[in-house]
Amino acid sequence: MNVALIDPTARVADGAWLADDVEVGPYCIVGPDVTLEDGVRLHAHVNVQGVTTLGARTQVYPFASLGTPPQSVHYKGEKTSLVVGTDCQIREHVTMNTGTASGRGVTRVGNNCMLMTAAHVAHDCLVGDNVIFANNATLGGHVEVGDNVFLGGLSAVHQFVRIGAQVMIGGVTGVREDVIPFGYAIGQNANLVGLNVVGMKRRGFSKSELHAARAAYRDLFFGEGTFAERLAGLRERQDASPFIKALVSFVDAGGKRALCHPSRGVVAQED
């Protein structure tokens, strides 16, 4: 631990492990079970507690509070953890809780994530890589978020919901059901309004791949027969498209929540 990089007003408990080039700014508090890897910077007034690991080059801004106990009535003081990946930007007033013994025991946030002001990650969440939380975006307990997801400002995700990779959640959206990979969901009670086409283009999807994805979306949600029959039809075609394969795998995996659908009366998204 390089003492020269710790502001004299900061408090770093005995037992904390800090890499040599970590910077701990004014009035930060670091608990005894915290690990700060290479290049981590706590700017000022940051609180890091619990069994918490912050990955290399992650930066944490003033008044963020990480690794505090889960907000669960079932928590009885068990030693659970928080793991944050590399190269994350954790902005002002962000909160992240550790896991619960009755859940995963750990809350995980992936690499290269940005959590804007006052975002919240609750106990036992699993967040993938390259995820962006806009201001005040909130995850309830046990939520799973795939890679490259964008959560709009003031959005709220109900506990145990799964959000697939590449999803866009609109601002001020309440998500109570699982959202398919590449989906775009908005509304006070979120409904699908199509695919996250802008995100797919940014990820290099070709015109033919976008056409196939839109066709599969229409077939699943607007086709003939029951939902189970339409899903079975896609299952037979899943080797033809990475999108279809990801879609079928997500639905087949299931979860504790229902699947988010388009609202009634919505017209299928056209090419």
From Swiss-Prot:
**Keyword Cytoplasm: yes or no?**
yes
Under the heading PROSITE patterns, the entry gives: HEXAPEP_TRANSFERASES (PS00101)
Question: Subunit comment for this entry?
Answer: Homotrimer.
Q: Does the keyword Coiled coil apply?
A: no
Query: Where does it reside?
Result: Cytoplasm
Q: What does this protein do?
A: Involved in the biosynthesis of lipid A, a phosphorylated glycolipid that anchors the lipopolysaccharide to the outer membrane of the cell.
EC code: 2.3.1.129
Which cellular component appears as one GO term in the record? cytoplasm
* InterPro entries found in the cross-reference section: Acetyltransf_C, Acetyltransf_C_sf, Hexapep, Lipid_A_LpxA, Trimer_LpxA-like_sf
Which reactions appear under catalytic activity for this entry?
Answer: a (3R)-hydroxyacyl-[ACP] + UDP-N-acetyl-alpha-D-glucosamine = a UDP-3-O-[(3R)-3-hydroxyacyl]-N-acetyl-alpha-D-glucosamine + holo-[ACP]
Output the GO biological process annotations, alphabetical, semicolon-separated. Answer: lipid A biosynthetic process
Can you tell which superkingdom this protein's organism belongs to? Bacteria
Q: Which UniProt keywords apply?
A: Acyltransferase, Cytoplasm, Lipid A biosynthesis, Lipid biosynthesis, Lipid metabolism, Repeat, Transferase
**This chain belongs to which protein, by name?**
Acyl-[acyl-carrier-protein]--UDP-N-acetylglucosamine O-acyltransferase
Indicate the transmembrane segments per the record.
none
Instruction: Cite the source lineage.
Output: Bacteria, Pseudomonadati, Pseudomonadota, Alphaproteobacteria, Hyphomicrobiales
Q: In which pathway does it act?
A: Glycolipid biosynthesis; lipid IV(A) biosynthesis; lipid IV(A) from (3R)-3-hydroxytetradecanoyl-[acyl-carrier-protein] and UDP-N-acetyl-alpha-D-glucosamine: step 1/6
